Amino acid sequence: LPHGGRRHAGSLSAVCGMMRTVTQRTRRLMLLDTASLYFRAYFGVPDSVKAPDGTSVNAVRGLLDFIARLVQDHRPDDLVACMDADWRPHWRVELIPSYKAHRVAEEVERGPDAEEIPDTLAPQVPVIEAVLDALGIARVGVQAYEADDVIGTFAGRATGPVDIVTGDRDLYQLVDDARGIRVLYPLKGVGTLQLTDEAWLREKYGVDGPGYVDLALLRGDPSDGLPGVPGIGEKTAAKLLDAFGDLAGIMAAVDDPRSKLTPSQRKRLDESRAYVAVAPKVVRVAGDVPLPDVDVALPREPRDPVALEELAERWNLGGSLQRLLTTLQT
């Protein structure tokens, strides 16, 4: 070949390399906040759905149906079921002892505390895990971290768009239009999804993703045992953030006698300094979780069809499992 031909071949090779890079960067990742979704499935599907031995499987079947619908509607390239290896990490409890304290069923000295969970849901969790494993859907939980932290780390490392499916508003903090990170929040069980992007956050709360951390800790969250700042509700928190920018700006205003804080706001914020100092670390999801090396590609065929067939028969997974398998294969 003449010199020009070699140059053309080299250019073509470079273009192909660029195309491969672009393809890798645009893979759509879907992250499931698994526990929040199977809780919703449990309460959204009648308890009359049973296995042959009488065990309830409403959460299992509801979750499988939900995943099938998610895959069909959003077509992710990669899918991870993120798990709570520790639903109440010690490092968060050390900072705010009330964190999720009301949900502790039993304290465990050398491990995660046992969480209160409905009697007919608890036996379904191992079934959910076994079915996900047999399907080949990546399931990731990391010791000493919540699923939120696993999600935050996966989202932070992603090179393409990310859909986070969760019933936990705390994950609104990860919304980032520039990086294509959005939250799909289930309404009315798991039947309808609210697409949460920056425009929705600003319209609803007046903040962006990172600003939601400041809003949440000021407002507090009884469901997580976060006290918030007394007298500072959601609307007041949003107004303060609009006026002073962020939490640091609000606390600087407490020390500035010329600021436009009301006397009662100044007093309550001043009295809450200890809480405000530690709450960001509790509310903000970790982005540095040591994730295992797993294949996150959406499976087209089950990893263990024999085990899956046995699970389907034992637990009466019937149409729910078949619908998911059909969706994965199309």
Model-predicted segments: where are they?
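Non-catalytic nucleic-acid-binding/docking modules located in mid-to-C-terminal regions
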Residues: 20-26, 75-80, 137, 178, ...
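N-terminal non-cleavable signal-anchor helices
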Residues: 13-16, 23, 166, 255
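N-terminal amphipathic/basic-hydrophobic helices that include classical n-h-c signal peptides
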Residues: 1-21
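Ubiquitous "structural anchor" signal
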Residues: 12-14, 52, 241
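Noncatalytic, basic helical substrate-engagement surface that gates or grips nucleic-acid strands
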Residues: 23-165, 169-191, 197, 276-278, ...
